[in-house]
Amino acid sequence: MRIALGIEYDGAKYCGWQRQVDVDSVQERLEKALSHIANKPIAVFCAGRTDTGVHGTGQVVHFDVDVDRQMVAWTIGVNAHLPRDISVRWATQVSDDFHARFSATARRYRYIIYNSALRPAIFGVGVSHYHGHLDEKKMHEAAQYLVGEHDFTSVRASQCQSRSPWRAMKHVNVSRQGDFVIIDIKANAFVHHMVRNIAGSLIRVGRGQETPEWMKWVLEQKDRRVAGETAKAAGLYLVAVDYPEEFGLPSSPLGPIFLPD
């Protein structure tokens, strides 16, 4: 039997999603909790491997299990064995041809900037703080040059192992809600550090250091050195993963919880 789960986590204290030797990861914590419920080792496969310090409200995983458990065991039961910064949001049985990574048609991220002269205390690890005023309208204008199919070499990390830098960008929207500037970005897939490098570049536009048209020029150069610096991990959330309707996965609020959808 194959089970899919929706996972939410605060990535601040973890080395990232992927299990690694001698360091704490979200995957390892989740697999331990699932194994406790199944009473046997469980391995999970995820939609996207987030980096150190990156959060998730819409991560999707799947695993195979041959024990009979009520579905509530994979939500409330698993949550009882997870730390407070990781939670299962939903669970459902899926067909054997479902794969959390390879069945996905798009991923959606939100990068959240707390744009205030004073640093936050409550949301210190859940947002990226920038003290100078940001013009979110110019950031949004610049972001529209990213929509469509492009070679994203200019916002690709040097250590990226993807075979191709080409990606299909569905949307990039920049908006403001009070002191929060939100970059909402969706693509079929992402190269390494793509969202954070885009965020760093858009911040340069928002600060008035570059014009919106500069973003188009950055893409055309196909050179990581011309784009903005990599924005901090703290503000980045994997908020949703799209799948074909045939799999019947539940939907849930994008989050994070302090932002309306």
UniProtKB/Swiss-Prot annotation:
Per the record, the GO terms for biological process are: tRNA pseudouridine synthesis
Q: Where is the active site?
A: D51 (nucleophile)
Keywords from the named record: Isomerase, tRNA processing
Q: What is its EC number?
A: 5.4.99.12
| Residues reported to bind substrate | Y109
Q: Name one Pfam family in it.
A: PseudoU_synth_1
The catalysed reaction is:
uridine(38/39/40) in tRNA = pseudouridine(38/39/40) in tRNA
For this protein, the record's InterPro entries field holds:
PsdUridine_synth_cat_dom_sf (IPR020103), PsdUridine_synth_TruA (IPR001406), PsdUridine_synth_TruA_a/b_dom (IPR020097), PsdUridine_synth_TruA_C (IPR020095), TruA/RsuA/RluB/E/F_N (IPR020094)
Region forming the signal peptide: none
Assembly description = Homodimer.
**Family designation:** Belongs to the tRNA pseudouridine synthase TruA family.
The protein in question is named tRNA pseudouridine synthase A
Q: What is the gene called?
A: truA
